[in-house]
Amino acid sequence: MRIEDIPHIPVLLNETIGLYNDMPENGYFIDCTLGFGGHSEAILEKYPNIKLIGIDQDAEAMHFAKNRLARFGDRVQFINKRASSALEELPEDLPVSGILADIGVSSYQLDNKERGFTFESEELDMRMDKTQDFSAKDVVNFYSKEDLERIIKNYGECRRFKKVVSAIISKRPIKSNRELADILGHIGLRDKKDLAKIFQAIRIEVNNELNELEKILKNAKKLAKNGTILGIITFHSLEDRIVKNTFKEWSKKCICPPEAIRCECGGNNQLGKILTKKPLVASKEEIKMNPRSRSAKLRGFQFIRG
């Protein structure tokens, strides 16, 4: 893909930029999932005193982002690795103004058959990080019946998980996404939404996505300073539930167990405030332009340090 062909409008752009209106304007903005750099570009344009740390495990996407953000010079630094690892390595005294994580597969990754995410791909791959050895081929062909049932049921939220797993195991070895889609079609899963949930489950397992999200939240909390705003964009209910529940816990003053007769924790455990009572979602206009934005949800939290 040429740099000119990169999609220039990232998901929930206006909503995301608006979320950071009250962040400190002279520190670092950490984009945990840089992708093609669309959100970061908008932040750098709006806040001339902000410096950016752009993180992404996808070297291909980062190559494009470097070109896109080259005009900002030394205001930008890039880290090509998993966000959880990169955040752990940043100094805790770093003046962090904002943190963003867009927890989703880009349209480029989904549409590029060579990346092995699409139903039509000739490879069972689904790796965000191409240097990683473990791929969808390992999950589909070598996981036990019990482990496959676990991920299809929990990550794919599929009621027919036993039938799906039986069909997969009976046709091993499976070599391509297209072959997998055909196998699922023969048991009645022909609808794209149904197929997408099965592929989603495998992709989550390959990239350890839910554990990665939890680590991002944990490390973001460590780095946050007074006024730091954290924004998380999710694309399915499993991720959104993790973010929603984490922000809810962080906003609690009292963390005593429900059975406690009186507060014994001091009642001063609140880390900040939730900025989005309900998640921000795409407008009708954005959904028309980008149907995949329909499932995107943005939640925000601002840390308050005494």
Swiss-Prot record:
Superkingdom field: Bacteria
Locations listed in the record: Cytoplasm
UniProt KW Cytoplasm keyword: yes
Cystine pairings recorded for this chain: none
Gene Ontology molecular-function annotations: rRNA (cytosine-N4-)-methyltransferase activity
PANTHER family reported for this sequence: 12S RRNA N4-METHYLCYTIDINE METHYLTRANSFERASE, S-ADENOSYL-METHYLTRANSFERASE MRAW
Task performed by this protein: Specifically methylates the N4 position of cytidine in position 1402 (C1402) of 16S rRNA.
Sequence similarity: Belongs to the methyltransferase superfamily. RsmH family.
Name of this chain's protein: Ribosomal RNA small subunit methyltransferase H
Taxon lineage: Bacteria, Pseudomonadati, Campylobacterota, Epsilonproteobacteria, Nautiliales
Name of the gene: rsmH
